[in-house]
């Protein structure tokens, strides 16, 4: 983490410097894969009665897929959680998070080590993720990191069950950070080129487990060199 530049003094006690902010993604940075998508696929498999409904919705799903991948995922998520309301949902994500963390190969040792190092150094660590808020928080609770700040996608209970209210993707991450008073950071770690808007806030952009081609595209998008790390 050497060579990071501290951000400008921000709000809080007058004259007191703000803690340096470090942003981390979750998917393929701290946890391998996309936990929310794995969870939703498990819910679809767990209730066979949903499959006829899924087949009946295929034409609609194809239309959603043409509109955007994010909309398709939101629709599939709504089908996966049909009839699952808030209390049941919380129980399910708690169980899923516990199982995920028990599988030691599901988490990046190097990523979690870097996150803990930042916290020990007094930096303000914020995890910014497309994963659903309660699921992400449950994962960190199981990791013994319940104090980590999490800014994530928002799902709400409705008459038919849980449904996505706000997807925390791309530029939306920057808007969500701004709503929490965060407009710059000393470093941002991510594995996805969708996070270019978030990387633009960072003095140091760090690409996790990216290919050379991905690294070149990121540098072209940002207009400067980035750091590439290989985490296991």
Label every PLM stretch briefly.
Residues 1-13, 17-19, 91, 98-232:
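C-terminal cap/substrate-recognition subdomain and adjoining C-terminal extension
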Residues 2-68:
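Active-site neighborhood of HAD-like aspartate-dependent phosphohydrolases
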Residues 23, 78, 162-163:
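Generic secondary-structure boundary/loop-capping signal
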Residues 33, 39, 84, 138, ...:
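Surface-exposed loop/turn and secondary-structure junction residues enriched for glycine/proline
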Residues 33-36, 47-113:
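A metal-dependent, Asp-based hydrolase signature
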């Amino acid at each position: 983490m050497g060579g990071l530049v501290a951000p400008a003094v921000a709000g809080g006690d007058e004259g007191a410097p703000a803690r340096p902010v470090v942003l981390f993604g979750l998917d393929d940075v701290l946890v391998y894969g996309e936990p929310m998508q794995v969870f939703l696929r498990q819910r679809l498999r767990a209730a066979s009665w949903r499959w006829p409904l899924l087949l009946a919705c295929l034409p609609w799903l194809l239309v959603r897929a043409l509109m955007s991948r994010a909309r398709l995922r939101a629709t599939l998520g709504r089908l996966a959680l049909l009839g699952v309301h808030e209390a049941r949902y919380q129980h399910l994500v708690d169980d899923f998070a516990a199982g995920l963390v028990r599988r030691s190969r599901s988490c990046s040792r190097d990523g979690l080590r870097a996150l803990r190092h930042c916290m020990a150094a007094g930096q303000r660590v914020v995890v910014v993720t497309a994963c659903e808020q309660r699921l992400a928080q449950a994962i960190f609770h199981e990791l013994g990191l319940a104090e980590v700040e999490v800014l994530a996608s928002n799902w709400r209970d409705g008459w038919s069950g849980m449904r996505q209210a706000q997807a925390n993707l791309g530029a939306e991450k920057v808007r969500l950070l701004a709503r929490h008073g965060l407009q710059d950071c000393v470093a941002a770690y991510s594995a996805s080129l969708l996070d270019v808007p978030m990387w633009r806030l960072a003095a140091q952009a760090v690409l996790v487990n990216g290919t050379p081609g991905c690294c070149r595209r990121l540098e072209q998008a940002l207009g400067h060199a980035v750091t590439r790390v290989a985490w296991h």
